[in-house]
Amino acid sequence: MKKNLYILSALFLAFSCNIARQISTSDFTPLNSFSQNCEGPAVDRKGQLYVVNYQKDGTVGRFQPDGKAEVFVTLPEGSTANAIRFDSRGDLLLADFSGHNILKINPETRAVSTFCHDIRFNQPNDICINRQDVIFASDPNWSNNTGQLWRIDKNGKATLLESGMGTTNGIELSPDEKTLYVNESIQRNVWAYSVSPDGQVSNKRLFFHFDDHGLDGMKCDRRGNLYVTRWGGGKIDVLSPDGKLIKSISTQGKQVSNLAFGGPDGRTVYVTLQDRKCVETFRN
């Protein structure tokens, strides 16, 4: 009997600890700090957070870890960014969906240039970049719920990797850069590809399918778990490297658009919310 009581007590304690460890978010920026296109969070080597469309469309905001904020750049007329990544030099690469470009920003001079423009682009939505500075870009056509997948080499040349996909949106590389993940917002699929260092993709397979809510930006943590923002669902779902749903993290807003990892240990998470027009944060 005592043994059974010990077992029950241990199970109750484990359950209680798990409840206590549930993650909750807090506001990193005030409500309504951004336009409704609040998106594209990325953290640089200094721990500074960059998010697009701060205060209004067509800007990039920069935030210190203590929350101090500024408009870092106003993009050229006709350009609206949706994603930010950093190359090996620390330059910012942006997916410019309204200008149909990949833009580059020098962080020291704040000069904006066009890194890639291709008339075949629908509207570049999200990007990721490997250690060889090869860019992968999702390119949806929201009018007919289709999408494309692109590779953009260091010389700015764009190569169409796949067309006829669903509504391509979130895109991410695994930490070892051997797997490329691409999701389809409307179809709720996450696809995985094998990828070589020079950006060749192969072995496409279905990594995970969701039954509800939209899919938006995705990021991997250092262990290779894939964090998928669930637009309209008010949560981030976390998938293990073998494609299992391991946890869900609730957000205060419903329209979760993207996330980024930061902090000295890489466990501070910044989340963009389009309905609340702000950034939420949590410790992972």
What are the language-model segments listed below?
Residues V51-V73:
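Beta-propeller domains
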Residues F63-K68, N106-R110, I152-G156, S194-G199, ...:
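Short loop/turn segments that connect beta-strands within beta-propeller blades
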Residues T59-G61, N101-L103, Q148-W150, N189-W191, ...:
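A short loop-to-beta-strand structural motif that recurs across blades of beta-propeller domains
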Residues I19-S35, K204:
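A short helix->beta-strand "capping" segment at the edge of beta-propeller domains
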Residues E172, K178-N189, P197, V201-K204:
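Glycine- and Gly-Pro-enriched alpha-helical subdomains that act as flexible
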Residues M1-Q22:
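Bacterial Sec-dependent N-terminal signal peptides
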